[in-house]
């Protein structure tokens, strides 16, 4: 079971606490924000991968999300997102993660309920990265954040129709933003889910609490 569990950690923290990660045998889900992508050296990424591989640790990668929108109606914003994802995949080619987590990006309020608009823009963004994931043997997992129900993500994943494009289900985000229960998410997306983010909150803030310290009713 431990081999299938990842621990989310920003890249800079991973480097600072690398000995602790290695001694504890933790499989890292490495978070790379925009500042990290702009400053990191390819050699450092390769060295990190090799050190973790020597200990038999598997890597997953979480790409940037602040200010980004892969389905943005503003084409310039979408293209900025594409550029950040391009950098993410450059890092991925050196880290060779099993999964690359990126936010799906649908928000009922920002898109005024226009799922078709978001979907049409999203379909421009993902195909090139799906091809890169296929070459690396990695899976892109799009994560729920502000989505109120699973249908926008389901439509996106089905439209891409690739085994390398799946879903990352986040329990904390569901507790904050979803209008339907967890069971409905898994009824709609269960076969498409390749990763689950397990954390808790009290229903007001994305606190990332230990399971049991919030109010999520885990099955």
Residue ranges and their predicted role:
Residues 67-72, 108-113, 175-177, 204-209:
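A short acidic, helix-capping loop that chelates divalent metal ions and anchors anionic groups
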Residues 127-215:
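Acidic/histidine-rich catalytic cores of soluble enzymes
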Residues 8-12, 31-35, 64-66, 105-107, ...:
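Active-site beta-loop-alpha junctions enriched in small/polar residues
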Residues 42-47, 77-86, 115-126, 179-188, ...:
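Charged helix-capping and loop-helix junction motifs
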Residues 48-66, 121-135, 218-219:
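Alpha-helix-loop-beta-strand connector modules within alpha/beta enzyme cores
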Residues 71-166:
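Active-site acidic/histidine proton-transfer and metal-coordination neighborhood
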Residues 3-9, 28-30, 59-63, 100-102, ...:
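Hydrophobic faces of well-ordered beta-strands that scaffold small-molecule active sites
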Residues 1-87, 93, 151:
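N-terminal pre-domain/capping segments
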């Amino acid at each position: 079971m431990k081999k299938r569990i990842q621990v989310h950690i920003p890249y800079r923290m991973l480097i600072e606490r690398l000995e602790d990660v290695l001694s504890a045998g933790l499989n890292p889900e490495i978070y790379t924000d925009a500042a990290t992508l702009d400053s990191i050296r390819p050699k450092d990424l390769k060295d990190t991968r090799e050190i973790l591989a020597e200990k038999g640790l598997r890597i997953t990668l979480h790409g940037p999300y602040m200010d980004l929108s892969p389905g943005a109606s503003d084409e310039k914003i979408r293209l900025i997102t594409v550029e950040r994802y391009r950098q993410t995949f450059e890092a991925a080619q050196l880290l060779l993660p099993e999964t690359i987590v990126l936010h799906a990006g649908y928000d009922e309020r920002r898109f005024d309920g226009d799922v078709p608009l978001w979907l049409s823009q999203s379909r421009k963004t993902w195909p090139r990265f799906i091809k890169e994931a296929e070459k690396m043997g990695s899976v892109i997992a799009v994560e729920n954040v502000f989505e109120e129900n699973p249908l926008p993500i389901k439509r996106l994943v089905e439209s891409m129709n690739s085994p390398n494009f799946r879903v990352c289900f986040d329990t904390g985000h569901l507790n904050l933003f979803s209008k339907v229960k967890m069971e409905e998410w898994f009824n709609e997306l269960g076969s498409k889910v390749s990763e689950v983010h397990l954390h808790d909150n009290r229903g007001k803030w994305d606190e990332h609490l230990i399971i049991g310290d919030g109010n999520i009713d885990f099955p």
